[in-house]
Regions:
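Short, contiguous, helix-prone interaction/anchoring segments in small proteins
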Residues: 25-46
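Acidic, metal-coordinating catalytic segment for phosphate/diphosphate chemistry
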Residues: 1-26
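Charged phosphate-binding loop/patch that engages nucleotide di/tri-phosphates or the phosphate backbone
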Residues: 133-154
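A short, compositionally biased N-terminal segment around positions ~18-40 that is enriched
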Residues: 19-32, 143-148
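Short glycine-enriched loop/turn motifs at secondary-structure junctions
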Residues: 21, 45-46, 110-115
Length: 154
């Protein structure tokens, strides 16, 4: 049995339950022309984000991670929801947010990993093709992100 089979993801477009620990905050960042920036790592397209540090808010975590990994400034950040991750007896949340791209600076080395990540702006309506999530929860999250972005940004 693969490790992935032991992990269950469920998408909730709700406020986070207080007792549920948050292990990551990731975001979908939109440009003014309805594109989304994706991080490219080892030939795979991914969202950007990471672990909250030093009692950061979700917004602070997302802004820091986008600077560290892609050197992109964000603004107009909205909470989207969370993925409930059930891994054996462990339960935790992966928070998802949306944001507008404020400024894109030259690529640089991520201080946390020592890597320089690729980045690409892709049409928002093609994001599922690039991320290629196998699970329903990830695809539901993308649908909700696109809807919230249309309501708030476009």
């Amino acid at each position: 049995m693969m490790v992935q089979d032991m992990v269950k993801f469920t998408w909730f477009k709700d406020l986070l339950p207080e007792q549920l620990p948050v292990k990551q905050v990731y975001g979908i960042a939109f440009s003014n022309d309805k594109r989304v920036v994706l991080r490219i790592e080892d030939g795979k397209y991914k969202l950007t984000g990471g672990k909250p540090e030093n009692a950061e808010t979700f917004e602070e975590t997302l802004k820091r991670e986008y600077i560290e990994e892609l050197n992109i400034e964000l603004e107009d950040i909205y909470y989207l929801g969370y993925l409930l991750v059930e891994e054996y007896s462990d339960k935790y949340a992966q928070v998802r947010m949306i944001a507008k791209i404020k400024d894109i600076h030259d690529s640089h080395i991520d201080p946390a990993t020592g890597k320089i990540y690729g980045r690409e702006l892709v049409a928002a309506n093609r994001i599922k093709d690039y991320l290629n999530y196998a699970d329903l929860a990830g695809n539901e999250m993308i649908d909700d992100a696109l809807q919230l972005a249309m309501n708030n940004y476009f």
